[in-house]
Amino acid sequence: MRKYVYSLTILFLVVSMLMSFASCSRADQIYVDKSQSYFSDYEVEDDKVFIKCHITIENTFEDEKTVTLSAILPEDVTNGLLKNETIKALKEDGSEMEFVLLPNTSNSFDVVFVGKYAGTNQKANRFLPEINIEIVE
């Protein structure tokens, strides 16, 4: 009889723990959906390099968020395409571009990252660069 009571108690505890884990909501976050994002093209004009990408960002927050984006391209510095490995998404006037993310949804953007040209018109690869997302307060 004791074994039966212990077994039921353990079973109850295990089921309770599983139910509490299942009901936990995922942490709010903003991240790039790499399966829906890709490098598109690059272009050199005068002393600037324009890296074009299609970026899909997931916003799991309950409210709208505004973010800025930057790309990290160390191979393109080594190759001689870029002077700096971190380049930002900029507007035509040169100011940093802000992206508004709707709550609890995927948001897709065509993004142009702009960096300083280092002299060699050769891209290291055509992979999506590492993307940094910064929430604007």
Residue ranges and their predicted role:
Residues R2-I10:
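Bacterial N-terminal signal peptides that target proteins for export
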Residues M19-S23:
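C-terminal motif of bacterial Sec signal peptides marking the signal peptidase cleavage site
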Residues C24-V49, D76:
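Low-complexity, acidic Ser/Thr/Pro/Gly-rich terminal tails and inter-domain linkers that flank the onset
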Residues F39-F50, E58-E64, F99-P103, T120-A124:
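Short, solvent-exposed beta-strand/turn "edge" segments of beta-rich domains on protein surfaces
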Residues I55-I57, F113:
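Hydrophobic beta-strand positions in extracellular immunoglobulin-like domains
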Residues E62-N84:
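Short acidic, flexible loop segments centered on an aromatic residue
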Residues N84-G119:
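Intrinsically disordered, low-complexity Pro/Gly/Ser/Thr-rich segments with frequent PxxP/GP/PP motifs
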Residues S108-E137:
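Terminal connector regions
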